[in-house]
Amino acid sequence: MKLNIGCGSRKVPGFTGVDAVAERTAAEIVARADNIPLPDQSVEEIMAIHLFEHFYRWECDTVIAEWKRLLIPGGVLTLELPNLKKCCENILSGRMEGGKHPDQLSYWGIYGDPRHGDQFMAHRWGWTPETLKAFLTEHGFVKIKEEPTQCHPAGRNHRDMRIVARRG
């Protein structure tokens, strides 16, 4: 089984959608990311695209422990999220791109999209590749690497990061 946790309305072929909001059309499992009703070591891959930044730092330990519980040994965890360092560099350099919303590469990466009006869509913690790799290592993940981003066209390459790790 492969999970797309925090799927929203995005269906990904080969992945089972998980979201805490029942109205999300792609969610086949309605559950919080820190309490998914599946057996231990029953998942071969977890993908969480633009989800991990929505947790407070103190929640991240519980969330990652749940995902580790679900993954088989050697199972893959893929996280894609804003890179706080790139967001800050974009602010300091004055890099403003994104069409109608020129602050997508900077402030949106830090705070989230201000148009939602939904407190759960706010970003609650920022990560850099270094801090996220250290966090995952601390939680027993191995073979941690940074890969080119694949989602969020506005942020690809200039704002976001993609980290892939394996459960140790």
For the regions a language model picked out, list residue spans one by one:
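S-adenosyl-L-methionine-dependent methyltransferase catalytic module, highlighting the catalytic core
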Residues: 59-62, 66-68, 72, 76-168
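N-terminal start-of-chain detector that recognizes signal peptides
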Residues: 1, 50, 134-138
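Conserved SAM-binding loop
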Residues: 2-87, 163-168
